[in-house]
Amino acid sequence: MSFSSAERTKMVALFHELGPDAPTLCEGWTTRDLAAHLWVRENRLDASAGLFIPALKPRLDTVTEEVLERDYDEVVDDWGKGAHKFNPLRYVDKVLNSAEHFVHHEDIRRANGRTEARDFSAATQNELHLPLKMMGSSFLSKSTLPVVLEAEGFPPIVTADKHGVADKGDAVVRVRGTVSEVLLWAFGRDAAQVQIV
């Protein structure tokens, strides 16, 4: 089972354990909102485009409201089955969902008293490093200072380096921790256990 699939399975169990009204780290969202987001993102590509294209956001909002009106456990179980047979996302699950499932699993865990960071195998850390490397710059593009992401065991990732000073180490923010925690931080989660210097 891939890491992405394992995280999906664990999230389904946690969604059911906590019910639809539990908090998450996603500001303003309950577990019902997060489950609806995950279902729409994976099952309604026409609507999920609204996550990235502002003109399509009204469609996203309409479809999300429809999903929120469905039975919570049914939505969770349907999402838990993964992308349907003819859904193109089924074939890129590992690449597309490793970070998404990890971060949202932590959103649920940490908002509900399970605050300890999890230990992962070297293979999983490698799998989580790829999205950090690919998306770190876009997540931190608005930073006024260069940010150096220093995940343990990996080369530093320099982001938001508009003036070319990061290589010299001047006037930068350094974020240190395991790759999983640095990834959480890059996704904007204050609960990430990182050192910022």
Region roles according to the model:
Residues V63-V67:
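Acidic catalytic motifs of isoprenoid enzymes
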Residues M1-G50:
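An N-terminal domain-cap segment
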Residues A36, E69-D73:
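N-terminal accessory alpha/beta regions
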Residues F3, E17-D21, R44-R59, E74, ...:
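Structured surface interface patches that mediate subunit assembly and partner/cofactor docking
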Residues T30-T31, D71, T178:
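Short, structural beta-strand-to-alpha-helix junction motif
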